[in-house]
Amino acid sequence: MCSLPGSRKPLLRVAVTGGTHGNEMCGVYLARYWLQNPGELQRPSFSAMPVLANPAATAACRRYIDRDLNRTFTLTFLGSTATPDDPYEVKRAQELNQLLGPKGTCQAFDFILDLHNTTANTGACLISEVSQNPFNLHLCHYLQLQNPGLPCRLFQFEPPGTESYSMDSVSKNGISLELGPQPQGVLRAELFSQMRAMVASILDFIELFNQGMEFPAFEMEVYKNLGSVDFPRTTDGHLTGTVHSRLQDHDFEPLRPGEPIFKLFSGEDVLYEGDSVVYPLFVNEAAYYEKRVAFLKSEKIRISVPALPGLTPSSTQTP
């Protein structure tokens, strides 16, 4: 029986991946450290496997070599016949799928935690591709309780179409941790320490789940993706303005109709023309310029999360 997201079996095969983007340095250096010092990832019921996801991009200190690895874990790419001309990240995605998957099968890892940094002022943010996943909701709530001085928000992002494509989608369940702001190619000590502590708390939560702890019901706020907004551009694609100073660094804060979002190079303000309040995130993220994204929009909703029952003694036994 597979330990799928809604199942009642312990999570024994866990991976922590860093360097999916080779210039997001907290995950890069944590993965490198743990590969040499894996004891920090050990818990009584499991030992998480550290993985440096994109070693070529990491060596070059670039987001990727040929294409974004974190957009490459679709069944089309994973199931394609390998050729010498394949982009590096397609080859690497297939290797990672063999190591941690195969995606969509009972042989896949139980859980992948994928580590990222952003240049945007998001603070700590968990990204879940599975809407209303009770395990991930309880995980986020646990982090909020364990780290009251570091707000941790949950962003629900369901990719367009029907298939997920991220690194953590290879496992039966998974989540991405974003921490910012940190410039590309730079390692900031306070963010390195914060990410390290959050990974420890996530592994502690999995251990408590495996040991049969019951987690009570609660209410929480989540941010649900509403799409993206591009920069103002000329017809040939060049920017004609940039993110307004009133919006810059205000991730997860309310953006109301009529408030400025861009400052044109000619001096005029561009105002938000939506008909309701939204909550922007990944504002002016450096890596998203090529994706024609100035920021993402989200709606903040409050949800009631049911209790996560404890596992039965028989199901908590390790093999």
UniProtKB/Swiss-Prot annotation:
Positions carrying Phosphothreonine are T318
Could you list the residue ranges forming a coiled coil in this record?
none
Subcellular localization: Apical cell membrane; Cytoplasm
**Per UniProt, where does substrate bind?**
R63, N70, R71, E178, Y288
Highest taxon above the source species: Eukaryota
List the GO cellular component terms.
Answer: apical plasma membrane; cytoplasm; cytosol; membrane
This entry's comment on the bound cofactor is:
Binds 1 zinc ion per subunit.
Q: Which reaction does it catalyse?
A: an N-acyl-aromatic L-alpha-amino acid + H2O = an aromatic L-alpha-amino acid + a carboxylate; an N-acetyl-L-cysteine-S-conjugate + H2O = an S-substituted L-cysteine + acetate
- Which InterPro entries has this protein been placed in? AspA/AstE_fam, Aspartoacylase, AstE_AspA_cat, Aste_AspA_hybrid_dom
> What membrane topology does the annotation report for this chain?
Peripheral membrane protein
Q: Which cofactor does it need?
A: Zn(2+)
PANTHER family in UniProt: ASPARTOACYLASE, N-ACYL-AROMATIC-L-AMINO ACID AMIDOHYDROLASE (CARBOXYLATE-FORMING)
HAMAP family assigned: Aspartoacylase (MF_00704)
Q: What does this protein do?
A: Plays an important role in deacetylating mercapturic acids in kidney proximal tubules. Also acts on N-acetyl-aromatic amino acids.
Q: What is the recorded name of this protein?
A: N-acyl-aromatic-L-amino acid amidohydrolase (carboxylate-forming)
